[in-house]
């Protein structure tokens, strides 16, 4: 059962969530100690070696650690929506950040990269679980990691940027048919889809039920089930409406509220896609577009002009920071995000 279902369907289960987070913190610390044992006899690490280590840690999230990766993503997102979960977020982040700090504390060159790696990993982890079996995705992730860890002032080669864009296109291609299916709908079904989307934006995907939507829309349950035959159809109808809204909001880079919704819903789409593969194209496209939307703003601040991989990598790191730090984080579109981005790029 997901964290969202615990929160919405079971009720206030603070003690249960506290126990879940405590267990995840123990797992994080155990994995940190295992990695430190692996690295203890290594005299030094360069950035290429750090890239390899981060990729391996993410691969482990796909395999034996996938349950923990999903739980952590859900805790962070639910805490972003529910201030009552803030203490759990703070505790989880302390151990999550401590994992990377513990790995690299003995390596001066790697130590300065810990913050950007930790933030990037927050954004990346659930997508590695969702898409980690895809060759194109794994290659894209490796390209992004190299760009994230490249020293400031070390421009990426044009061939590397072309390769990165090629991988993005390869990954987006198979999703196109499904995205084209999210065409505009009209009439009663469109009104209901907007109600579903409003509920998702407010409470998250896990909160959606036939009874809730029928009540908020003021229609009989039979009317709702006529247009949406199953719970999956109900969710997909709301997702398609949110997707259309997101496409419109991405034309307004300064819209902080829209940016927050995209941040939350992109991760919720990835989590939802782990249960229903029909959501996967939306998760892929939302994630791609959120980085493309702020490329012009991000690139000059991170030595990434003409380098899509680097601007995408730092966008991911900044989004990870916003998720990890809650209201203290600076998401793309906020007034303080240029300063924060420059700080990350100087590590």
What are these regions (language model features)?
Residues 1-19, 195, 199-233, 237:
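Helix-turn-helix
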Residues 20-24, 28, 188-196, 213, ...:
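Generic hydrophobic, amphipathic alpha-helix propensity
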Residues 28, 69-78, 89, 114-118, ...:
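Short, structured motif recognition centered on aromatic/hydrophobic residues
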Residues 30-66, 117, 247-267:
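Hydrophobic alpha-helical connector segments
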Residues 64-73, 80-106, 259-264, 277-302, ...:
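Amphipathic alpha-helical packing segments from all-alpha helical-bundle domains
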Residues 86, 90, 105-168, 280, ...:
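Hydrophobic/aromatic-rich alpha-helical bundle segments in the mid-to-C-terminal region
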Residues 113, 188-192, 262:
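N-terminal positioning helix adjacent to the helix-turn-helix/winged-helix DNA-binding module
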Residues 165-203, 210-215:
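Basic, helix-initiating cap at the start of DNA-binding domains
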């Amino acid at each position: 059962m997901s964290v969202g279902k615990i929160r919405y369907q079971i009720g206030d289960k603070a003690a249960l969530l506290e126990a879940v987070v405590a267990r995840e913190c123990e797992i994080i610390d155990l994995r940190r100690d295992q990695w430190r044992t692996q690295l203890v006899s290594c005299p030094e690490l360069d950035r290429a070696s750090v890239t390899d280590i981060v990729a391996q840690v993410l691969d482990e999230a796909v395999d034996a650690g996938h349950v923990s990766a999903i739980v952590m993503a859900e805790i962070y997102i639910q805490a972003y929506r529910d201030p009552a979960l803030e203490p759990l977020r703070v505790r989880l982040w302390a151990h999550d950040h401590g994992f990377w700090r513990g790995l690299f504390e003995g390596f001066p060159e790697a130590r300065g990269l810990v913050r950007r790696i930790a933030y990037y990993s927050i954004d990346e982890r659930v997508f590695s679980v969702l898409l980690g079996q895809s060759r194109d995705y794994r290659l894209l992730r490796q390209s992004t990691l190299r760009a994230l860890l490249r020293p400031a002032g070390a421009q990426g080669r044009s061939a590397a940027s072309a390769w990165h864009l090629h991988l993005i296109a390869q990954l987006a291609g198979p999703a196109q048919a499904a995205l084209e299916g999210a065409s505009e709908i009209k009439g009663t079904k469109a009104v209901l889809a907007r109600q579903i989307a409003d509920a998702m934006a407010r409470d998250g995907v896990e909160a959606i039920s036939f009874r809730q939507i029928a009540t908020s829309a003021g229609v009989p349950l039979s009317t709702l089930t006529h247009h949406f035959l199953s719970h999956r159809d109900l969710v997909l109808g709301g997702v398609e409406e949110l997707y259309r809204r997101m496409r419109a909001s991405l034309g307004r880079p300064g819209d902080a509220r829209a940016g927050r919704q995209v941040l939350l819903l992109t991760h919720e789409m990835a989590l939802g896609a782990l249960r229903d593969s029909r959501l996967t194209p939306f998760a892929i496209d939302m994630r791609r577009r959120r980085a493309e939307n702020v490329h012009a703003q991000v690139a000059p601040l991170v030595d990434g002009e003409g380098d899509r991989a680097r601007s995408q990598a730092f966008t991911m790191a900044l989004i990870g920071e916003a998720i990890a730090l809650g209201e203290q984080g600076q998401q793309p579109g906020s007034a303080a995000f240029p300063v924060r981005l420059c700080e990350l790029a100087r590590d």
